[in-house]
Amino acid sequence: MPPPPFRDAPSSAKSSQRYTPLHESIPEELNDKQYSSDADSLPLSDPSDGEDDSEIRLRRVDRNGTRSNQATAYVPVVRKSGDVEAYFDSIAEAELELLSASRQYDGVDDDDDDSDGYGVGVKRGQRQGLLKRTHDGRTGWRTVYYSKYWWRALIGVVVVLVLLVLVFLGLARSKQVGDELDYSMIPAESWFPSPRGGALKEWAADYQKAALLVGNMTLIEKVNITTGTGWQMGLCVGNTGPAESVHFPSLCLQDGPMGIRYADHISAFPPGLTTGATWNRDLIRERGIAMGLEARLKGVNVLLGPSMGPLGMMPAGGRNWEAFGSDPVLQGVAAAETIKGIQSNGVMATAKHFVMNEQEHFRQPFEWGIPTALSSNVGDRALHEVFAWPFAESIRADVASVMCAYQMVNNSHACENSKLLNGILKDELGFQGFVQSDWLAQRSGINSALGGLDMSMPGDGLHWADGKSLWGSELTRAVLNTSIPMERLNDMVTRIVAAWYHLGQDQWERPPPDGEGGPNFSSWTDDQTGWWQQASVEAGDQDGGWGIVNKYVDAGAGHGDIARKVAAEGIVLVKNNNNTLPLSRSPPSPYRIGIYGDDAGPALGPNACPDRGCSQGTLASGWGSGTVEFPFLVSPLEALQGAWETEVEITPYLQNMVMPVSVQDKDLCLVFANANSGEGYIHAGGIHGDRNDLFLQKGGDTLIQAVANNCAGPTVVVVHAVGPVVVESWIDLPGVDAVLFAHLPGQESGNALVDVLFGDVDASGRLPYTVGKSLEDYGPGAQVLYENNAPVPQVDFLDALYIDYRYFDKFNITPRYEFGFGLSYTSFELSKLYIKSMQWKSRLPKSRPQDQVSPPEYDTRPPVNENVLFPEGFHALSKYVYSYLPSLDGTAAANYTEYPDGYDLPRQPSEAGGDLGGNPSLYEEMAKVQVQVANTGARAGQTVVQAYVSFPSDVVEEGDLVEVPVDEKGETVTFVPSKEQVEFPDRVLRNFTKIALEPGEKKTVEMTLSRKDLSYWSARQQNWVMPDGDFQIWVGQSSRDLPLHGKY
């Protein structure tokens, strides 16, 4: 998302707009002289320039980073004699058989015309070194660009070509045996064409209305709807152009995942991490309803939340706090409930960031001074089972919009990755809404449209607020010259309009000049009057539209209770020696209380730093576009000062340093410490988005030790943090009596904390992540890449199946506090586990159902005799993104040839698809799990009953054909499929429920397990497979407290 308006966003190093096949290109802005050239062939380094001789060897690589369920690839490794490898041999995805050893980058000069590239003859460098492979009888291409020195790459090409000859000879021989070695189990890199929306009955009526409306729009109006008007070129952070002839309004898109950003009279709800820590489905839904209502009252069409990416694979990831925790099922449930709540008020929700936006370092090139964004590399199985899981649940919840991520996935930008957007999102998961880019995440024009992107935000292309769009007028030109099919544009527009109808926004009051609707606030000023097109005015154009921009509609009234309840239930009690908590409101007099740490106080106020881009005072949210302008913030100190019923002596020490004399006479010591992080465009306190480590910040660990070692009474530690923190330096100190992980509580911070400290609310939060004893405990695949490791930074998620607690279980690592853990002020006992089979097991789901309805048919012809030029006398605002063309240059139909390979070979629909979220058979109930829960304590309280599944052991799949001798001498051989072991985590969360019980009360809770819950994604079969054998069902109150066990 964008930087705040007060801050000039840095520019990328490249201004020319270029378009190359999405899976054959380093991103367009890469202009390092070592890697790009204007010549027809790339200049290679002279091998006699003093370099040592190089050794070429093959490295065996297992797909997906494991030896299960994947074939083996051999990757050429160029090694400098006596030196390190010259490139980082990251495996782009589980589908690779071979990687090429060289790469020719786009050769367009930096000074080329910005507006070219849409089928009008842009010069390109020659492609070299591509390796050909067979997939389902078709030809595909793979590229890689890790070689650091091109002369080594040339040698590598020769070696690889020799290997290819041997490989193809082997393939030819194997085809005489059968088709098994056609590698049909390996999904293609590309997926075309983009599936049309409107094939599901739930959306059929909306698509019919949308198709009719779109059919009456001009080309200019259609492009308007797909392209933002530019940064600060409307009242919201994102604004689309209108279609005035059919009275379709400009849409307002506004952050975010914890409330309405840049708006007045709204609520600062606890963010996603705190919400996930409640494990309370009903409460999460209530929060979503309140957020949706506030958006509706403010005139927001599209709320840019919830966030389920990052998933929390990296515990130090800067934006983990925006999402709901480090497990795909927990994330999926919380996201789905939030979406249902938001959309119940007619506001479109946005599931973001699709997908694998796990770290802030190198997510955007201009933020880090590098040529291009990093690539998050993952295998097909982990992509489905971990990262895409919560998005599937969001689509099942009928989400209207999905936002694609900044970085690349498997070396293709997420916002033009056709396998992700067309193949997985729109086909396999049945997504019926529209895909929007994150702000400036679009990196190409033609390829992003063909790859599945439907809306470009904020409209500007490669730079902030420059008015130069990758779509806009260039999309108009591309449709006219037929380089982008008219059918694709029609589907893009219809998806957006259908979502508008689907949420009932056609019934909203129309914005001016037709009515008084639309956004009633400005993201750029708090004053009542202001400019409608702020960026134009800042560029010197005084025609940016002045008027009333803030109507100060009170949207947050009545939502404080919901915010407070979420914050309280999101507090996790992890230590409580001798029942230190809850505190008494009537302690004996005199009673001296010390409150320590700047995290306890208000300091300079909640909005002292724009987008909360600093750490001062109590920590109530992380920083970045996912936060809001707080209407107020109740600090812990303020709430505590009025919490006791009898007279007590409270002395605050709002610094992170303390002298023993300030502690030794206290009857109770409350210590506050925090750890902060946020989005990568803000650097604060030496933190560049991602945390540098998992320790408390600003001397928090030292402060806790000093207080705990000297306090005369018990010490209670309160931690406000964006994720797990390492507590080993103080957690076992005798003086540390109680510890609360209060996460990020939002505006009601102090009030919610007091509710739990004094027992007005039970301590019922549970950890949505694992607290390890060190950062290294989470595994090498969970570490942020802090130093650039290649021309295109590579992050390999080799252990992604083993995220968080799964990694601890796999390697038998003892955490400090496990996933799902949390103490209560009462006690609970689970008993009487009963598992009921609901239907017979079968290995595969039912066949994909046929389309429920026919999607709209579109006119595939470009418009004829339609005026696409700026109207005569039209005053074009500076920086505004228009769809009009200044001239007809480049609009003649052209034989565009730069399409990605496979574009003209339509893909077959996935057997895993067929409805919202996938094949409906995947969500059929296979088993019911019942358990009795009893409150055995003396207080009312809540607990979270958690169900985990262990998959059968010794699961195998048929692999590649291998030679097996028929006779003893081995002179005759046959080919048989190899047997490959399929690995699984020890156990995985599959369901949970939160239950409230009075003292002595018992209740039976019931949870279901679906086919998908009991299946794994087979990269070979490209489907969800339920293995034969017994499943172990575990039920308890955390991932390591599972007293009940049964079989299914």
Swiss-Prot record:
Gene source species: Aspergillus oryzae (strain ATCC 42149 / RIB 40) (Yellow koji mold)
Gene3D superfamilies xref list: Glycoside hydrolase family 3 C-terminal domain, Glycoside hydrolase, family 3, N-terminal domain, Immunoglobulins
Keywords of this entry: Carbohydrate metabolism, Cell membrane, Cellulose degradation, Glycoprotein, Glycosidase, Hydrolase, Membrane, Polysaccharide degradation, Signal-anchor, Transmembrane, Transmembrane helix
Keyword Cytoplasm (UniProt): no
Spans within the Cytoplasmic topological domain: 1-150
One Gene Ontology cellular component: plasma membrane
Molecular-function GO term, any one: beta-glucosidase activity
The name this protein goes by in its record: Probable beta-glucosidase E
Pathway listed: Glycan metabolism; cellulose degradation
